[in-house]
């Protein structure tokens, strides 16, 4: 466990250093948001199950699923938030997720992600320093819950680097809700490809005559 923590700490310190020195390069590639969300959900549900925590997707309404952006960093941001929602939750607790989009114009959408947990929440004093490196709620918290104290600073930096925003509401002993908004370009080429495939599939059976042969008079009448 100690070696695992040390490796995680070293990796996150390096990541934080890259973000601060503007060395992190975002991808600009096509990806399917639904497939990405499905991958995240499979991993998170497995982690949650170990503590009897229920994942409830209240809403998923992303119409433009073929987007252009940095899926690797999107995945890391969402995974960080959901992992914390499990880590700081109560046994047999719940996590409520909502994902939807707002279309800004013909070429751009903003995807909104909301994560609400029934966990231990945060004190008002800790809320003011949640994005500070190595911040912890109280002495010994890292021993109890694990983590390096760099997850939230990295998450905030990545969200802002992608042109998005992150905010939260929290009440001690009552849970925390995080809100993330990230803009993406719509991948029109992929949308057109899927539309064309659908048209070809529909055209392939359009106007086809089907002969049904029955040896029973009642079936023939039906």
Please tell me what each predicted stretch does.
Residues 39, 46, 50, 58, ...:
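Disordered, acidic interdomain junction associated with two-component signaling
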Residues 122-136:
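Short conserved segment of the HATPase_c
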Residues 146, 150-151, 155:
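Short alpha-helical Gxxx[C/S/T] motif in the catalytic ATP-binding
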